[in-house]
């Protein structure tokens, strides 16, 4: 993910840059919650955005009503939605989400994952999701890359669940349970990284 974001340079292999339009939601963000920083202010901390762009992003993530509220007064789920709004404000081709539901209650997690799917569909952008939530990873993704200090395995969720390294990491039982998920969608992924409707 950090190579895709341009934070790290590749060590080996090749990386082909597809787009400069990448949105990012970090796992953790350090903010002094005592600062009088409103949702609107947060949206323009590092770049200028017009009012329409800000309102559109906050509306899409369902938090337009919070634009004048101090960030310190927001719940974990509300703050994640503001972070997501900031990440999609430039209509990215790729959205990198690092543990996007951390600090969010279970009901909020479900709502956030549904929102992420909606954003992907509406903006027609790819999602690179970093998560330790095996249920979500195996049930709601097209392609899984399993890391444990190195790439253990990658492929469709069903292929990964059958992989011996995956089984060694998570156990045969987890592999059998998670391999029951089938991801159905109305599109295909080309070798060039494009998505085409069936």
Label every PLM stretch briefly.
Residues 51-66:
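Conserved ABC ATPase "signature" region
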Residues 70-74, 78:
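Conserved ABC ATPase signature
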Residues 91:
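Conserved catalytic motifs of ABC-family nucleotide-binding domains
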Residues 95-99:
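Catalytic Walker B motif of ABC-type/P-loop ATPase nucleotide-binding domains
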Residues 131-132:
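H-loop/switch region of ABC-family ATPase nucleotide-binding domains
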Residues 144-156:
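H-loop (His-switch) and adjacent beta-strand-loop-beta switch element
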Residues 162, 169-198:
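ABC ATPase nucleotide-binding domains
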């Amino acid at each position: 993910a950090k190579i895709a974001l341009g934070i790290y340079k590749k060590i080996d292999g090749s990386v082909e840059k597809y787009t400069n339009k990448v949105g990012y939601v970090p796992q953790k963000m350090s903010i002094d919650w005592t600062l009088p920083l409103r949702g609107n202010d947060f949206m323009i901390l590092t770049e200028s955005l017009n009012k329409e762009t800000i309102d559109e992003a906050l509306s899409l993530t369902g938090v337009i009503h919070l634009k004048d509220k101090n960030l310190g007064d927001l719940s974990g789920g509300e703050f994640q939605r503001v972070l997501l709004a900031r990440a999609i404000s430039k209509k990215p081709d790729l959205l990198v989400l690092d543990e996007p539901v951390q600090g969010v209650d279970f009901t909020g997690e479900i709502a956030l994952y549904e929102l992420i799917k909606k954003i992907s569909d509406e903006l027609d952008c790819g999602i690179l999701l970093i998560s330790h939530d095996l249920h979500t990873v195996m049930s709601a993704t097209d392609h899984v890359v399993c890391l444990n200090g190195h790439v253990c395995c990658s492929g469709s969720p069903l292929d990964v669940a059958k992989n011996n390294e995956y089984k060694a990491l998570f156990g045969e039982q987890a592999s059998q349970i998670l391999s029951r998920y089938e991801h159905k969608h109305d599109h295909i992924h080309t070798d060039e990284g494009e998505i085409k409707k069936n």
